[in-house]
Regions:
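Non-catalytic interaction/regulatory segments
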Residues: 56-60, 64-509, 514, 527-540, ...
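Gly-rich Lys/Arg/Thr-decorated short loops/hinges at beta-loop-alpha junctions or inter-strand turns
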Residues: 273-275, 523-531, 567, 640-654, ...
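Conserved phosphate/anionic-ligand binding catalytic regions in large, soluble enzymes, centered on
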Residues: 372-376, 489, 494-524, 556-580, ...
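Extended, regular secondary-structure scaffolds
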Residues: 401-456, 657-722, 732-760
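Glycine/serine-rich phosphate-binding loop and adjoining beta1-alpha1 elements at the start
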Residues: 547-683, 707
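Non-transmembrane, aqueous-exposed alpha-helical and coiled segments at domain scale
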Residues: 549, 577-578, 669-688, 705-714, ...
Length: 874
C-alpha cells in the first residue's frame, strides 16, 4: 500500500509545487463535518492516469500555430467529475480489501460502522490525492479526535499524544495498528464521559453477566460491590470489556486504591506473538500517563499494537486511570517478562508518574542512561545550584550547571555512579573505597580548565554526593528523590548559622527543602507556586534561602516552647499540580524517617541516628493535605503519625478554624494603636492588609477586627494573589466576612458593596499586577498587617517606596503576621523613619505555641480521648 512518507508539521496556506494550497488537498469527500489535516507539506504528484488528457492537449505547444481564437482552458465539469470519481474508485478498490484484512478484529468491535466508513473515506481521499497518510479528524464538537499515521514503530504513539490538547481532559483512548505495521489509527475522546446507569437493555445484560461471572469465578466480588464499581465507570468502558477483564481491572484498582501508586500486570495475549499489559495509576492525568507510558515502551524498543485508556472512580480517594496495551518486540515476538530489559521497562512504568520531564529528556539525549540515573543527575545539579548561587548567580545559573553536566557527561555519570555505589543496599561502598574513588574524580576534575566554572560545578556535584547521609534512591516505588544531607554543604556567609539537619527532595515539577535548627524542631510546610516562568526563575535562586530564613525565624519564635525552629518549602513549576507535589514531597521525606523495616533495608544510613520531623500547615496547604499527610504517615509506619502534622481538621487545633495566629497578631495591634494614641475600641482607625480573606492569617484578622472593634476598624485595602480591593471609607465588613466564610479571594468582592471611591481590581485587569504589588506602599493607613506575601517583599533596595512624599511611613505601625515580609535591613530603616514594627517572631508566634500543645497532646492521647478535651477547652 503506497501511503507516502510521514512529515513534519506544516501550516495552511502554503503552496505545493503545482501551485495549489494544502487547504485544497485537505478536502475529503463526505468528511465535511471533520477537520482533516495533513502535517506534511510534500505532496506526491498525481499519476498520469489521473490527469485529464483533454485538458493537457488544450494547451498550445511551442510549435503549434498561433490561433486568433481564445483558448478555452476551463475544464468540462462532467469529465472532471468522472476522472475524480475513477481516481477515488481505484483507490477504494485497492484500500478497502487491504484495510478489512489488516486491521485487527478489536478495531471493528470498538468502532461503529459510521466511524469505520469515515476513516476509510479519509484514507482513500489522501491516497487519491497523492498525500502522505498523516491525518487528524475532529468531530463537530471537537470532543473526539482520530489521528491516522503511516507506520507503526516505537515512539509513534508518544508523538501523537504529545500533539493532543491539554484541555478538556482526555477521558478515553483506543489505539489500533494494522497487522502489517503500515498504519496506526488512534481515537481519543475528551470531556465528560457518559456514565454507566444500568438503564439500557445492553447495560442491564452486562451487569447480569458480570454478576453471574463473579458467582462462579470471583466470589469475593459481591453484587453490591459490582454495582458500586460499575457506577464509577463510563458506559462505553463497561460495554467494551468482558466480565473477566472487568474483574482483572477491579483487582488492579484495589491494589492502588488510596495509595497514589501504580500497578503493572502482564499476561500472554491469545492471538499471535503478543503480550497484554495493564497499568493502573491512582490519581493521574490520563493524557500525561498515556504519553509517558508510550514513551517508556518506545525507550524499551516495544511496539504498541493496540492500546486503551479509561478512568474509573475510586471514592473517596479520587480516580484510577486504566491503561491497557497489547505489545510485542520490534522483531514481532511476545515480550519476555523475565528479561532484565523488560524488568527495567516495568520499573520505569511503575515510577513514570513521579519522574520529572527534564529527567526524561536528559535520559533520551544520552544512550544507555536510565531514567533513575537522569533523575539523580538532575537532583545533584539542582542541589548544587543552591550551593553555588551566592558565588555568582549568572555564572552558576541552573541552566549553566545543567549544560556543564551534559557537556562533561562522562565524568558527571561517574559522579552519579559513585553516589549509587555508596548507597547501594546490596553492597554499599565503604568509606575507604569511596574516598579513593572520590579522590580520583577530584584529580580528573582538577585537570580541566575553568574559565566558565566547569571544575567548580563538577566539584560541587561531587561534594553533594559526599554531603549525603541517606537517600531513598533504591526504593522501587518512591514518589520522588530525597536526600538527608549535611547542612554544612549549604552554609555560606548569607547562611551563617549551622542547622541541625537538612532534607532535599526533588520530583516531578518541583523541588524543596526541610531544614531544622534542633533535633526536635517544629515549623510549617509551604508551597510556592509562581504564576509564570520568569517568576519561577527568580524563586528557584532563593529556595533554600527562604527555608533557611523561615526556619531561623521559627527558631527565634520558638524560644518559649520545647521545640526548635524548622521550615519546609516546595517550589513548583508554574503548571504543576499542588496536591501531587505535596504528596511527592511528604512521601519522599517519610522514606528517610519511617521505621518500616522493609524500607529501612533499602536505605543505607550514614547519619546513624533516628530522626523525627514535625510539620505544620503554611501557604497553600489545605485541610485535605493535612489529613492525607497524617494518614500517609500512619500507612508508612512512621513512629508518631498523629504528631507528624499539626493543625489537623479532626483531632487537632486547626489554625484557620480557631484563628490562633491572628489572635496573637491582634493583641500586638491593639497595643501598638494605644501606644500611638488610638483606643481601637472607642476610636476609628484604618488598616491595610496583604493576604486574602480566604487565607488563615488575613482572613481571621478580618473576622477578629470586626468582632473586637466593629466599624471602628476601617479596612482600606486588601491585596492577595487574585488582586486588590480598596476603599478609603473602609471595605464593607459584611461582604469581607462572606468571602472569609466561603474561602474566596478579594477579587470576588461584590463591587456593589463598594463606596463611591472604592474599587476592586483583579490581577487580570490592565495594570492589575502592579496595582496589587504596590498596595502595601501606596495606601495610607494607621496600621499595616502583612498577613501574606513573599519573603523580602520590603527589602534594603525598596524600603523607601513605603514612605510618603514627606518621608513618613505610609502606615506608622507594622504588625508582621507573615514571616520575613521585611528584611532585617529594611526593618531598621523603617524604624529609623518612625515606624513602630512588631517583628514576625513575636507577633505571629501564637500559632506555633498552639501547635506545640496540640502535638504534645497527640503524643499522649488517641483521637477518642483528644476530641472531648478539645471540645471542653476550645
Amino acid at each position: 500500500m503506497d501511503v507516502g512518507d510521514m512529515g513534519d508539521a506544516g501550516s495552511n496556506g502554503r503552496t505545493s509545487p503545482a501551485g495549489r494550497s494544502l487547504r485544497e488537498y485537505r478536502q475529503a469527500p463526505d468528511c465535511r463535518h471533520s477537520d482533516v489535516h495533513s502535517r506534511d507539506t510534500r505532496l506526491i504528484p498525481a499519476s498520469p492516469r489521473g490527469m485529464n488528457h483533454e485538458m493537457a492537449s488544450a494547451h498550445p505547444t511551442a510549435t503549434a500555430p498561433a490561433s486568433t481564437q481564445p483558448v478555452n482552458i476551463v475544464p468540462d465539469p462532467t469529465v472532471l467529475a468522472s476522472d475524480l470519481g475513477k481516481s477515488f474508485q481505484r483507490s477504494a478498490e485497492e484500500i478497502v480489501p487491504w484495510f478489512v484484512a489488516q486491521m485487527p478484529r478489536m478495531y471493528f468491535e470498538d468502532t461503529s460502522a459510521t466511524e469505520v466508513a469515515n476513516h476509510l473515506r479519509a484514507i482513500i481521499a489522501a491516497r487519491a490525492s497523492g498525500q502522505p497518510l498523516h491525518l487528524t479528524l475532529h468531530s463537530d464538537d471537537r470532543r473526539q479526535w482520530t489521528i491516522i499515521r503511516e507506520g507503526n514503530k516505537p515512539g509513534v504513539l508518544a508523538e501523537v499524544v504529545r500533539s493532543l490538547p491539554m484541555s478538556p481532559s482526555l477521558r478515553a483512548a483506543k489505539i489500533h495498528g494494522s497487522k502489517d505495521g503500515a498504519i496506526v489509527l488512534d481515537t481519543f475522546e475528551f470531556g465528560e464521559r457518559s456514565p454507566f446507569t444500568g438503564t439500557t437493555p445492553e447495560q442491564t445484560e452486562k451487569l447480569k453477566a458480570t454478576i453471574a461471572f463473579a458467582n462462579s469465578h470471583a466470589k469475593d466480588w459481591t453484587e453490591s460491590a459490582i454495582r458500586a464499581y460499575f457506577a464509577g465507570c463510563a458506559a462505553d468502558y463497561i460495554a467494551t470489556l468482558t466480565p473477566h477483564r472487568l474483574n482483572k481491572h477491579r483487582l488492579l484498582l484495589q491494589s492502588v486504591s488510596g495509595s497514589e501508586g501504580t500497578a503493572v500486570e502482564t499476561e500472554p495475549e491469545l492471538e499471535g506473538q503478543l503480550t497484554r499489559m495493564t497499568i493502573a495509576f491512582s490519581n493521574a492525568r490520563a493524557r500525561t500517563m498515556l504519553e509517558r507510558c508510550a514513551h517508556v515502551l518506545s525507550r524499551g524498543g516495544i511496539n504498541i499494537q493496540r492500546a486503551y485508556l479509561d478512568q474509573v472512580a475510586d471514592p473517596p480517594f479520587g480516580s484510577v486511570t486504566m491503561l491497557g496495551f497489547v505489545i510485542q518486540t520490534q522483531d514481532g515476538k511476545s515480550v519476555d517478562t523475565s528479561s532484565a530489559a523488560w524488568k527495567q521497562v516495568a520499573h520505569d512504568l511503575t515510577r513514570i508518574k513521579w519522574i520529572d520531564s527534564e529527567s526524561i529528556w536528559l535520559a533520551n539525549r544520552h544512550e544507555g542512561m536510565t531514567l533513575d540515573e537522569a533523575e539523580l543527575i538532575l537532583g545533584l545539579c539542582t542541589l548544587s545550584h543552591q550551593h553555588l548561587v551566592h558565588r555568582d548567580r549568572l555564572l552558576f545559573s541552573i541552566e549553566r550547571i545543567l549544560a556543564t553536566a551534559e557537556r562533561t557527561i562522562t565524568i558527571t555519570r561517574q559522579i552519579a555512579d559513585l553516589f549509587r555505589a555508596r548507597f547501594n543496599p546490596a553492597a554499599p561502598l565503604d568509606d575507604a573505597h569511596f574516598n579513593k574513588r572520590a579522590a580520583a574524580l577530584r584529580a580528573d576534575i582538577g585537570t580541566k580548565d575553568d574559565p566558565e566554572g566547569t571544575a567548580t560545578i563538577l566539584v560541587a556535584l561531587l561534594d553533594a554526593v559526599e554531603a549525603t547521609f541517606r537517600t531513598n534512591f533504591f526504593l522501587a516505588k518512591r514518589f520522588g528523590l530525597s536526600m538527608r544531607i549535611d547542612p554544612s554543604y549549604l552554609r555560606d556567609d548569607r547562611r551563617p548559622e549551622l542547622p541541625y539537619g537538612t532534607f532535599f527532595v526533588i520530583g516531578r515539577g518541583f523541588f524543596g527543602f526541610h531544614n531544622r535548627f534542633k533535633e526536635i524542631a517544629r515549623g510549617g510546610l509551604r508551597v510556592v507556586k509562581p504564576s509564570n516562568a520568569a517568576q519561577h526563575s527568580r524563586e528557584r535562586e532563593r529556595v533554600f534561602d527562604e527555608v533557611y530564613g523561615l526556619s531561623w525565624a521559627q527558631q527565634q519564635k520558638n524560644k518559649d516552647i520545647p521545640e526548635g525552629g524548622a521550615k519546609a518549602a516546595i517550589l513548583l513549576e508554574p503548571e504543576s499540580d499542588i496536591t501531587r507535589c505535596v504528596k511527592s514531597f511528604v512521601d519522599s521525606l517519610l522514606d528517610l524517617i519511617t521505621d518500616d523495616p522493609a524500607v529501612r533495608k533499602q536505605v543505607v544510613d550514614r547519619f546513624g541516628s533516628r530522626e523525627l520531623i514535625y510539620l505544620g500547615p503554611d501557604e497553600n496547604i489545605t485541610p485535605d493535605h493535612i489529613e492525607w499527610i497524617v494518614s500517609r504517615a500512619r500507612a508508612r509506619k512512621y513512629a508518631m503519625p498523629d504528631a507528624f502534622m499539626s493543625s489537623k481538621p479532626g483531632a487537632g487545633i486547626n489554625h484557620k478554624v480557631y484563628g490562633v495566629t491572628s489572635e496573637g497578631v491582634n493583641v500586638f495591634l491593639e497595643v501598638a494603636l494605644r501606644a500611638r494614641g488610638i483606643d481601637p475600641r472607642k476610636q476609628p482607625f484604618t488598616v491595610k492588609i496583604t493576604g486574602g480573606p480566604d487565607g488563615d492569617v488575613a482572613g481571621n484578622m478580618i473576622r477578629i477586627l470586626d468582632r473586637d472593634y466593629g466599624n471602628n476598624a476601617r479596612i482600606v485595602g486588601i491585596a492577595d494573589g487574585s488582586g486588590v480591593g480598596e476603599d478609603p471609607d473602609g471595605l464593607d465588613h459584611t461582604e469581607l466576612l462572606r468571602l472569609f466564610k466561603e474561602a474566596l479571594p478579594i477579587a470576588k468582592f461584590d463591587p456593589k458593596k463598594l463606596g463611591k471611591h472604592g474599587a476592586v481590581v483583579p490581577v487580570e485587569a490592565p495594570g492589575g499586577v502592579m496595582i496589587r504589588n504596590t498596595l502595601h506602599n501606596r495606601l495610607k493607613a494607621d496600621a499595616f498587617i502583612p498577613g501574606g506575601g513573599r519573603p523580602a517583599t520590603i527589602n534594603e533596595s525598596n524600603w523607601r517606596d513605603y514612605l510618603t512624599k514627606d518621608g513618613k511611613p505610609s502606615a506608622p505601625i507594622i504588625v508582621e503576621g507573615a514571616n520575613l515580609f521585611l528584611t532585617p535591613g529594611a526593618r531598621k530603616e523603617l524604624f529609623a523613619a518612625g515606624c513602630l514594627i512588631f517583628k514576625d517572631s513575636s507577633a505571629n508566634k501564637c500559632g506555633v505555641i498552639c501547635s506545640s500543645y496540640e502535638i504534645g497532646a497527640s503524643m499522649l492521647l488517641d483521637e477518642k480521648s483528644f476530641m472531648p478535651a478539645l471540645k471542653r477547652n476550645c
